[in-house]
UniProtKB/Swiss-Prot annotation:
GO molecular function, a single term: structural constituent of ribosome
Gene Ontology terms: biological process: translation
Keywords per UniProt: Ribonucleoprotein, Ribosomal protein, RNA-binding, rRNA-binding
Keyword RNA-binding: yes
Gene Ontology CC annotation, any one: ribosome
Identification of the protein by name: Large ribosomal subunit protein uL24
UniProt KW NADP keyword: no
Known function: One of two assembly initiator proteins, it binds directly to the 5'-end of the 23S rRNA, where it nucleates assembly of the 50S subunit. One of the proteins that surrounds the polypeptide exit tunnel on the outside of the subunit.
Description of how the protein assembles with itself and partners: Part of the 50S ribosomal subunit.
Provenance organism: Prochlorococcus marinus (strain MIT 9303)
Protein family per UniProt: Belongs to the universal ribosomal protein uL24 family.
Length: 118
């Protein structure tokens, strides 16, 4: 009988086309249709944290004597495949294309609007 090993998590970074500070729209899930700014990217897990999306409530115990416990709400991560870059000018979500400029630099461009992001 073959010996099975537990599934290992990959530690390889995944190239993401969504960066911190981008405006994105959620395309699936309970927060579908919401837009927000990317607060943080997690490239190893291929996830992003978006402002105002996937809100979780956490109960925090008091750390010092005399302090009371509290309830904290915070954004949890969303898989990067569940969000699309959003154009604030045209109010539309779009896929991303990488464009190589004449000087050799790479820019991101929205496919639907042709708008350059970087």
């Amino acid at each position: 009988m073959p010996i099975t090993t537990p599934k290992q998590k990959t530690t390889q970074r995944i190239k993401m086309r969504i960066h911190k500070g981008d405006t994105v729209q959620v395309i699936t899930g309970k927060d579908k249709g919401k837009t927000g700014e990317v607060l943080r990217t997690l490239p190893i897990e291929n996830r992003v944290i978006v402002q105002g999306v996937n809100i979780r409530t956490r109960h925090v115990k008091p750390t010092q004597e005399g302090e009371s416990g509290r309830i904290v709400t915070e954004e949890a991560s969303v898989h990067a495949s569940n969000v699309m870059l959003y154009s604030n000018n045209k109010k539309i979500a779009s896929r991303v294309a990488l464009v190589v400029e004449k000087d050799g630099s790479k820019k991101r461009r929205l496919k639907k609007t042709g708008e350059l992001i970087d």
